């Protein structure tokens, strides 16, 4: 009887593990959707969306940007930081 209970609990645990992992929706590059070919370093409001609360640049896997636009975004953020449009560190 205890063996059956143990096997039932094991199967319910595996079912819970599978159901807890849901397939995430693939993110699409927002710059490609809006047909923005060159990212401008002076557009500070758009650049702020791709920074964390600590001021770090978000990775591609979280933003959903394509490789080309992620490179342009990184360059634009770094230029904006040098020109003091964006802070290096957020307090």
From Swiss-Prot:
<feature type="compositionally biased region" description="Low complexity">
    <location>
        <begin position="1"/>
        <end position="14"/>
    </location>
</feature>
<comment type="function">
    <text>Binds as a heterodimer with protein bS6 to the central domain of the 16S rRNA, where it helps stabilize the platform of the 30S subunit.</text>
</comment>
<dbReference type="GO" id="GO:0022627">
    <property type="term" value="C:cytosolic small ribosomal subunit"/>
</dbReference>
<comment type="subunit">
    <text>Part of the 30S ribosomal subunit. Forms a tight heterodimer with protein bS6.</text>
</comment>
<dbReference type="GO" id="GO:0003735">
    <property type="term" value="F:structural constituent of ribosome"/>
</dbReference>
<dbReference type="InterPro" id="IPR001648">
    <property type="entry name" value="Ribosomal_bS18"/>
</dbReference>
<keyword id="KW-0689">Ribosomal protein</keyword>
<keyword id="KW-0699">rRNA-binding</keyword>
<dbReference type="GO" id="GO:0070181">
    <property type="term" value="F:small ribosomal subunit rRNA binding"/>
</dbReference>
<dbReference type="Pfam" id="PF01084">
    <property type="entry name" value="Ribosomal_S18"/>
</dbReference>
<dbReference type="InterPro" id="IPR036870">
    <property type="entry name" value="Ribosomal_bS18_sf"/>
</dbReference>
<comment type="similarity">
    <text>Belongs to the bacterial ribosomal protein bS18 family.</text>
</comment>
<feature type="region of interest" description="Disordered">
    <location>
        <begin position="1"/>
        <end position="24"/>
    </location>
</feature>
<keyword id="KW-0694">RNA-binding</keyword>
<protein>
    <recommendedName>
        <fullName>Small ribosomal subunit protein bS18</fullName>
    </recommendedName>
</protein>
<keyword id="KW-0687">Ribonucleoprotein</keyword>
<dbReference type="GO" id="GO:0006412">
    <property type="term" value="P:translation"/>
</dbReference>
